[in-house]
């Protein structure tokens, strides 16, 4: 039995990671120590589980050993400067918000009003790959910040947010990695827009993810344990002002049980399905 132990000085939690020669439906759920009877009970309520993973996120050092690229170094240096000196300039905020959040000027204006530096750092911390998190994810986070600042009484009753974001660059990396970039470009032409969409859809469904992305998927699955996961689209167009894009792309529910290999396969298939749904007729007609 291999497990992690966490405490916030009020409650004690264990989170099983590996178990040998035994099985139960709740085995990989986080458990809370019940002092009154000396037992550990699995966390099942959404509120309790969200609180637990907020604690894990605060205690876990995510600065793993890795070769940082220029963007990662920029974020790391920016965060260090802010922590030590309290400096977070408008120019730096412009770079981060344009790169990670949105290019919509109205959204960017709201971000400057409601987002704090730590909000940007938390988004970065929860990203798989790089690029933009898309309109739906950005809008959801912004809505929470508006409620937090303008209606703190209501915000106090909201569950902690607990999502990961697949950066827009991963979409293009997936295309290049699976060698159908040329098909992707030809599909964008007037002649190939509808004609090549079914072929491109199949390419999305049959591709594989780069190993670096798969490793980040595994880390995310380790973090969530065997909690159900919903993979949702959040394209650059979705939920922008005047461009709702509602219901055009797929959302996929992952049961997220079984071995790590089974859970990883389920997650990868869900992401493939969402990517492929960009080629459905309804979405194509909406984007014209």
Which residue stretches match the model-derived regions?
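Nucleotide/phosphate-binding sheet-loop regions of phosphoryl- and nucleotidyl-transfer enzymes
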Residues: 1-288
């Amino acid at each position: 039995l291999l497990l992690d132990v966490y405490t916030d000085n009020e409650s004690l939690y264990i989170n099983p990671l590996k178990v040998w020669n035994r099985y139960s439906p709740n085995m990989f759920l986080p458990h809370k120590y019940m002092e009154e009877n000396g037992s550990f009970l699995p966390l099942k309520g959404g509120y309790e589980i969200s609180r637990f993973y907020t604690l894990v996120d605060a205690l876990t050092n995510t600065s793993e050993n890795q070769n940082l690229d220029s963007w990662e170094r920029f974020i790391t240096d920016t965060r260090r400067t802010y922590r030590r000196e309290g400096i977070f300039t408008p120019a730096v905020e412009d770079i981060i918000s344009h790169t990670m959040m949105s290019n919509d000027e109205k959204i960017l204006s709201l971000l400057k009003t409601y987002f704090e530096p730590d909000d940007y750092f938390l988004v970065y911390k929860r990203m798989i790959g790089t690029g933009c998190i898309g309109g739906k994810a950005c809008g959801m986070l912004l809505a929470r910040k508006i409620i937090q600042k303008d209606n703190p009484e209501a915000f106090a009753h909201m569950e902690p947010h607990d999502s990961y974001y697949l950066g827009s660059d991963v979409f293009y990396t997936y295309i290049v990695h699976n060698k159908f970039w040329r098909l992707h470009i030809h599909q964008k032409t007037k002649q190939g827009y509808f004609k090549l969409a079914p072929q491109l859809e199949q390419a999305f469904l049959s591709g594989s993810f780069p190993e670096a992305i798969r490793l980040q998927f595994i880390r995310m699955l380790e973090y969530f344990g065997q909690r159900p996961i919903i993979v949702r689209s959040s394209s650059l167009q979705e939920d922008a002002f005047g461009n709702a894009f509602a219901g055009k792309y797929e959302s996929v529910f992952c049961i997220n049980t079984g071995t790590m290999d089974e859970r990883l396969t389920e997650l990868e298939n869900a992401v493939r399905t969402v990517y492929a749904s960009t080629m459905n007729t309804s979405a194509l007609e909406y984007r014209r």
